[in-house]
């Protein structure tokens, strides 16, 4: 059996949660690198939301066609989480567009103050 790869989108069970954390079963993109994903029981994900009325500077807009999704969505970088792979329900899409991957990487760097 394979392992989740960076850029793949899974339906993820985020419950139980506390406070403002993302709740329910929603899509999330795998953010952690493939070496980590292959050997660790955890993966790092960024949840997606189809509520795109407002896109904040720390979110990445994704067209449904570019990721195999049912709706246009935004990736919520501020909600990054490392989760057990048991929370992954099933693969529902994939982000292959290098421009989107680069935007995600840039947002993560900015979020953690790693950009120069």
Provide a role label for each language-model segment.
Residues 23-24, 30-65:
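Compact nucleic-acid interaction/catalytic patches
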Residues 2, 67-116:
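C-terminal terminal-subdomain/extension
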Residues 18, 52, 84:
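Feature marks short, surface-exposed loop/turn motifs that line or immediately flank catalytic pockets
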Residues 17-25:
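Short, Lys/Arg- and Gly-enriched loop/turn segments at beta-strand edges
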Residues 1-3, 19:
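Short, surface-exposed secondary-structure edge patches
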């Amino acid at each position: 059996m394979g392992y989740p790869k960076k850029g793949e989108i899974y339906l993820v069970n985020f419950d139980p949660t506390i406070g403002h954390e993302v709740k329910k079963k929603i899509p999330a993109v795998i953010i952690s690198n493939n070496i980590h994903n292959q050997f660790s029981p955890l993966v790092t994900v960024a949840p997606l939301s189809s509520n795109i009325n407002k896109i904040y500077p720390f979110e990445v807009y994704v067209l449904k066609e570019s990721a195999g999704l049912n709706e246009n969505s935004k990736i919520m970088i501020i909600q990054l989480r490392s989760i057990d792979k048991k929370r992954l329900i099933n693969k529902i899409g994939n982000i292959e567009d290098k421009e989107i991957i680069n935007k995600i990487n840039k947002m993560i760097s900015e979020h953690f103050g790693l950009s120069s």
